[in-house]
Amino acid sequence: RRQRARRRQFALLGLAVLLIVLIFAFRHLISTPQQSGADGDTGNSGTSATEEVKQVAKAVNVYQSVMYYQPVVQKYAEQNGIPEYTDVLLAIMQVESGGKLTDIMQSSGSAGLPNDSLEEESSIRQGCTYFAHLLSKGKSLDCDLDCIIQAYNYGSGFLDYAAKFNGVYSTELAEKFAEKQSGGNTIQYDNPMAVQENGGWRYAYGNMFYARLVKQYLIE
């Protein structure tokens, strides 16, 4: 009888251990996020890489070479507290490099470094950090998003300038700032948007078409 009782105890103990193991395994399975992206270190609450790309692609229409970096952009956007601007950052990357340059967001200058001195991920990290700074300053000055996007190209001083005009972006506002900063000097610019509007030129400071170039890759 004692042996039977012991066998029952061992059997019950074994079943209890097995049940605990199964419970932990199941909880781990449902709580582990799927990894995504070029470097495989960005998770998004169980969303697969393909699903993430489709979600962003609904808001932004850019080259596949840019979409390749979407998980990295999203990671640093989240670190800077601006995940909802991931699509805007991808559109900025499209205009800056088309996803084909090493300093992929052309952000070296905003960090006080020589141009084209950052590698891809460092460039994305700095680009996201800089945009977050512009976003914070722009909001404090009541500037709209187009002004903030234009400031990525012109520098944060454009936000101070725009704030004097109620912080509302316009083509004329961007042109006047570039005219002032360039001393009225112009250069040839063969972008189709410029060719259609003025025959193909811009002021020799930044790119007065910048916000509009970025916005053409965003799907409203």
Regions found by a protein language model. Give the residues of each.
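Non-catalytic cell-wall polysaccharide-engagement segments
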Residues: 1-53, 60-66, 114-125, 129, ...
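Immediate post-signal-peptide N-terminus of mature secreted/exported proteins
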Residues: 57-65, 70-79
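Hydrophobic side chains within well-formed alpha-helices
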Residues: 69, 88-89, 210
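Short, charged helix-capping/linker segments at alpha-helix termini
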Residues: 77-86, 142
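Short, functionally critical alpha-helical segments immediately adjacent to catalytic or ligand/cofactor-binding
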Residues: 83-100, 107, 127-128, 148-154, ...
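Short, solvent-exposed loop/turn and secondary-structure capping segments
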Residues: 102-105, 162-164
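Short linear capping/connector segments at secondary-structure termini
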Residues: 105-113
